[in-house]
Design a protein with these regions (language model features):
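Condensing-enzyme catalytic core of the thiolase-fold
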Residues: 1-177
Length: 177
């Protein structure tokens, strides 16, 4: 994080986060909070997952978490586990009025965000449908949105018969479908 800020001459809050699969979205949440608190006027948030060693695959295989097919058949009865991969994603965030004033192209509006952790569940990699539903409901409330207004949901969905089902249940309950 410091190297990027140095080379791009960025100032303001600067830190790296580690929250497993949710690190990138946690970074977006933290960046949006920094903007709301006037700690900065623009934020760069993102996530990186680079598997640079076979140790990761060995650990997943030992835990019986690796999928047998690629791509992983998410939300499917044929789901057999995760297929890890490398990825890098980053976005620039700005307050809406500032982006309009500066003539920036606006690709989306983050109406609200929130963070939670599921606590003790069936296992460390297993989500809690109740806590996920509560978080979704909290974000909808903060954004003043009715569940019927939701047009798209981006899900974690790793291709696991257990966790995909739990995530589906959580989203369905929160959106009351």
């Amino acid at each position: 994080a410091a190297r990027i800020a140095y080379f791009l001459d960025l100032s303001g809050p600067n830190f790296a986060l580690s929250a497993a699969c949710s690190s990138g979205l946690l970074a977006v949440h933290q960046a949006s909070q920094a903007l709301l608190n006037n700690e900065c006027d623009m934020a760069l948030a993102g996530g990186v997952s680079l598997i640079l060693s076979p140790i990761t695959h060995l650990g997943l295989a030992h835990s019986k978490m690796l999928g047998r097919s690629h791509p992983a058949p998410v939300f499917s009865p044929n789901a057999s586990g995760i297929v890890p991969g490398d990825a890098i994603a980053a976005i620039v965030l700005k307050r809406y009025d500032d982006a309009v004033r500066d003539g920036n192209t606006i690709h989306g509006i983050l109406a609200a965000s929130a963070v939670n952790y599921d606590g003790k569940t069936l296992g460390m990699a297993s989500p809690s449908p109740a806590r996920q539903s509560q978080l979704i409901e909290k974000v909808l409330d903060k954004a003043h949105l009715d569940p019927n207004q939701v047009q798209m949901v981006m899900a974690h969905s790793v291709g696991s018969a257990l966790t995909d089902k739990i995530e589906y249940e959580a989203v369905s309950k929160a959106l009351k479908s």
